[in-house]
Amino acid sequence: MAADRNTGHTEEDKLDVLKSTQTVIHKALEKLGYPEEVYELLKEPMRLLTVKIPVRMDDGSVKIFTGYRAQHNDSVGPTKGGIRFHPNVTEKEVKAVKALSIWMSLKCGIIDLPYGGGKGGIVCDPRDMSFRELERLSRGYVRAISQIVGPTKDVPAPDVFTNSQIMAWMMDEYSRIDEFNSPGFITGKPLVLGGSHGRESATAKGVTICIKEAAKKRGIDIKGARVVVQGFGNAGSYLAKFMHDAGAKVVGISDAYGGLYDPEGLDIDYLLDRRDSFGTVTKLFNDTITNQELLELDCDILVPAAIENQITEENAHNIRAKIVVEAANGPTTLEGTKILSDRDILLVPDVLASAGGVTVSYFEWVQNNQGFYWSEEEVEEKLEKMMVKSFNNIYEMANNRRIDMRLAAYMVGVRKMAEASRFRGWI
C-alpha cells in the first residue's frame, strides 16, 4: 500500500487508532520540550495481560474465553478504565485496547485525576449468552486478573456491553478473593453496592458541558441550536435527551442501521421509549438516511458518539457543522482533524469531551474510600466545575499556541505523566 508523501503514512496507518494516538503524543511531547525517552515510555501500555477463562456453559460444556487487561502508566496513581465484552479479537482490536488505555491516561491528566489509564475486556458476544453464563464469565475474568487489579492498583469500570450488574458480580468475586468487602475495586456499580449518583449518564453530562462551553465561545445560543448526534447508545441517547431538555433542536440521530432526520427537530422522548437495549431505533422507520449523510447534515453542533474513524479526509470537507464535539473515542482521524481546523470548525477532542465518565468514576472511588456519599446535585456540581475548568484551560492553550484543541489536550494530558515519571526517577 502506497504511503502519503507528506506523512509517510499508508491509508491503513491513517485509520490505525494506536498509530494516530502515538503521532499526537510524540508531537505534544516535542512541543513541551521532553526528550525522546519520554515518548518511548508513554507510547504503549507498560503492561498487557492476556488470560484464558474456562466457563461451564448451561448445556454442560466448557468454553474457553480470552480476556485481556492493558495498563498504560501508573506514575500518577492506580490505572483506571473500562472492561468491554467484544465478540471479535484481532490485531486491530488489541491495538484499539492499547490506544484506549492511553486515552484514559490522557483523560485523567486533562481532568487532573490521580490515575493512569487502563482498559480491558473479554472476547465474547453477550447477546448469545445466558444471565448465569455471563455471571460465571465475569467472575472467572476477575479471578484471572486479580493479581494486577485492586483499589490501589487498577480500578475497572463498565464499557461496551457491560453494565452495573456485571460490575456487581466482579466486585463480589474480588471481595471473596481479597477476603474483605472492596467496593473501591471497581466503579459503575449499583447504588446499593456503593455506586455513585450520576454515573450512568456521566459521559453524556460531560459532553453536554463541553457543548455548552464551545457554543459560548462561538456565540451560539443552545436554545434553538441544531444538533446532530451519531450513535444512540448510552452516551448518544442521554446526550440527545440533555440537548433536547436544554432547548436545542435535535435534528438528526443514528444507530448502526441508519439515521433519522427532521429539520424541525426529532421527538427524542418518543425515540427513547422505542429504542432497544442495544440502542437501536431506526429499524422501526422506513424513511431513513445513511450514517454518512447524517454526518454531513447542515447543523450547528455535530456529536459523533458511535465508533472510531467516522470523520476522515474523505468527508471532512463536507462537514457543515460549526462545532464538532467527540463523544466517541477516536471518531476523527488526524487528517480529518486538520481539515476541520483549516475550515475553522471548532473540534472538541474525545480525551476532553468524553472525560465525564472517568470523572464520576473517580467520585465513586473517593466515596467508597471515605464511606460518605454525595447527592446527585453534588456530583453534577463537582463534575461541571472540573469539566469547565479543563475545557477553558485547553481552549486557552490552543488559542495562545495557535494549535488545535486535540494537540492542546494531549499536551496537558502527557505533561502530568511525564512530570510524575521524572520525579519518580524513571526518566
From Swiss-Prot:
The keyword Transcription regulation does not apply. Coiled coil: none annotated. Substrate binds at residues 80, 107, 361. SMART domains: ELFV_dehydrog. Disruption phenotype: No visible phenotype. Cells lacking this gene show no growth defect; a double rocG-gudB disruption has the same phenotype as a single rocG disruption. NAD(+) binds at residues 203, 234. Keywords: NAD, Oxidoreductase. CDD domains: NAD_bind_1_Glu_DH. Induction: Constitutively expressed. SUPFAM superfamilies: Aminoacid dehydrogenase-like, N-terminal domain (SSF53223), NAD(P)-binding Rossmann-fold domains (SSF51735). The record marks 159 as: Important for catalysis. Gene3D superfamilies: 1.10.8.1210, Leucine Dehydrogenase, chain A, domain 1, NAD(P)-binding Rossmann-like Domain. Its EC number is 1.4.1.2. The active site is at residue 119. It catalyses: L-glutamate + NAD(+) + H2O = 2-oxoglutarate + NH4(+) + NADH + H(+). One of its GO terms (molecular function) is glutamate dehydrogenase (NAD+) activity. Belongs to the Glu/Leu/Phe/Val dehydrogenases family. GudB seems to be intrinsically inactive, however spontaneous mutations removing a 9-bp direct repeat within the wild-type gudB sequence activated the GudB protein and allowed more-efficient utilization of amino acids of the glutamate family (called gutB1). This 3 amino acid insertion presumably causes severe destabilization of the fold of the protein, leading to an inactive enzyme that is very quickly degraded. This is Cryptic catabolic NAD-specific glutamate dehydrogenase GudB. It comes from Bacillus subtilis (strain 168).
